[in-house]
Each structure stands twice: as C-alpha cells, then as structure tokens.
C-alpha cells in the first residue's frame, strides 16, 4: 500500500537527484566516526566543501588515511610522504579529499554531499577499498567501486577518472593481487583508467617491501 508507494517514489526521486541507493552495504552511503581521537570526519568534510568552493581544484584525489595523511590542505599533524605531495601532487593542482578509515560507502556519502559539485576538475583519482577488506566480499567491493565511479562520473562528466588499485598489505599480498585483477577488469570495462600500485611496493618474492611502509604493513612511508 502506502509504504510500497513511498518506496517507489523515493527510488524515483533518488534517480532524478543522482543519489541512488544500492542493495549492498558498499552501495549505501553512510557517515563514519571511526577515529575521533585523530580527527572529526564531518568537520573535515565541511572543510573540503569550503576548500573546493573557495579554490576550485584542477584535480582531486579521494581516499582513506593513505591519502588523508599524505599532504595538502586541510592540514593534518600526521604526515607520511609530504615531500612527494609537495613535489608531485601540489604542482599538478591536486586537492586532497582523503578521510582516515573511510570505506567505499563513506566516500559515496561525501560524493553525494557536494565534494565534487560546483567545479570542473580535469582529473579525479580514486584510491579506496582497503578498509572494506575482511568486511565485504570481493564482489561487493568491486560492485561498490562501480557504483561509486558512476556517481563520480555524473558529477564530473568531463574529468579523466583514474582508479588506483588496493595497495599491498602484509600477509594479504595474494588477496590484494587477486582483487586488483577484478577491479582492473571492471574499471577498464567501464571506460576508466586503472593503475596498479602493487609492483613498486613488493619484493621479488611477492611480499611487501617493509622498508617502504611505516611499520604497520599497510601505510606507505
């Protein structure tokens, strides 16, 4: 009856507004507050909105803590790899849109709430998914990324979109290799670019090169 009708109407409105809800947890946008001792997620999101409004970026990178603590504005006390940010990312005009502990569905929420609106970026880079591992199946991760990419494309139709595969993790190198193969296939089929970060961070034997990580076997230094 009425409830069914309401669901149909909501679905339609969501389609019109380009904020569809998927059926997998990776396709349902949600906020998060997993690291309140480090930073406030919603405050950072609001800072992003202000940043892109006041300084429309030429390029953006969306991601989790690996991106968050890399460099750029808004500033953060933790930094891994600031020199690389200053040398490569800043001259290329990148705005950092990374939030520590984000999963695919959290980036989806941020995209639905204005982080890619009101400006035209030449380049959008997406590096997300590692925090979904162990929680979601490989299929859900790939489908979540597909869903998120479509939301990105709707908001930045002229940007070139590049997906960076999941970085190798200690003791999960083989899993990362397999899922990146699936992600690459989906990304290229959908017409985006894929970059596999893995090879440079691994040793000959396929294990991660510990000297390139900060000690947790997950975050590059």
Task: Name every feature range the model reports, one short phrase each.
Residues 1-62, 66-87:
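N-terminal secretory targeting modules
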Residues 67, 101, 199:
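Short, glycine/acidic-enriched loop or turn micro-motifs at the edges of active sites
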Residues 4, 8, 61, 102, ...:
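Extracytoplasmic/secreted proteins, especially bacterial periplasmic and envelope-associated proteins
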Residues 2-3, 7, 170-221:
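Catalytic His-Asp segment of secreted/periplasmic serine-dependent ester chemistry enzymes
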Residues 152-161, 185-193:
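A structural motif corresponding to the C-terminal end of an alpha-helix
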Residues 68-90, 104-146, 151, 155, ...:
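Oxyanion-hole/transition-state-stabilizing segment in secreted/luminal serine hydrolases
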Residues 59, 97-100, 138-145, 172-176, ...:
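Solvent-exposed, acidic/flexible segments
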